Amino acid sequence: MTTKEKIKDAFIASVIEKQTVKISDKDIVRRAKISRRSFYNYYADRQSITEDIYIETIESTIKECFDKKMTTEMFITEIYKAFFKNKNFFIVAIKDDEQNSLFDTIIERNQIVFSYLYKDIIQDQIKLDYLSYKYASTQVMLLKKWLNNGMVESPEFMTEVYLDSHKNYENMHESIINKKTNW
């Protein structure tokens, strides 16, 4: 096991055990049985570990899905499955509300993915920036709700909800726009 893997494993185990991401560097170093210097050779802080865990588990899944040229439904399901497989960590990590939290990381990283996907379709850079942020934020808000609810629903169910929200919007818009606003 590499030093970097020891650090991540120690962090994940501590987060799950203590039910918080507010784990000190000292605790991580002690649990990983490494020096502080070794820790700082790889990571600046716990947020950078969280980001690396996200990249390793979720972004690697995204890249695999692209390589396999999966359908949209299969693709989205695999992403939800990757979160589900690591739910003990992600359920705790999503609750962190500090700057550079998992929530911020997912939005930022998803925005990069969406920008990449749509850059050839949407030529206006400002519009691309806003739309990629919109898609990333929408996806992350749905994910956050699922995580905060304890991931009771299946990855397949979440895929259905995610895809339905995009497919049905235009159809629903016509019937919704004519409703009275009496809430």
Role assignments for model-derived ranges:
Residues 65, 90-93, 146, 150:
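Secondary-structure edge/capping motif, primarily at the C-terminal ends of alpha-helices
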Residues 145-183:
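C-terminal peripheral helix-coil segments that are non-catalytic and often amphipathic
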Residues 4-12, 16, 21-25, 30-33, ...:
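An amphipathic alpha-helix adjacent to DNA-recognition modules
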Residues 70-115:
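Helical hydrophobic small-molecule/effector-binding pocket
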Residues 6, 75, 134, 138:
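Charged catalytic carboxylate motif
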Residues 13-20, 67-68, 120, 147, ...:
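Basic, amphipathic alpha-helical hairpins
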Residues 98-141, 148, 167, 171:
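Amphipathic alpha-helical packing segments from all-alpha helical-bundle domains
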Residues 3, 71, 98, 102, ...:
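Conserved acidic
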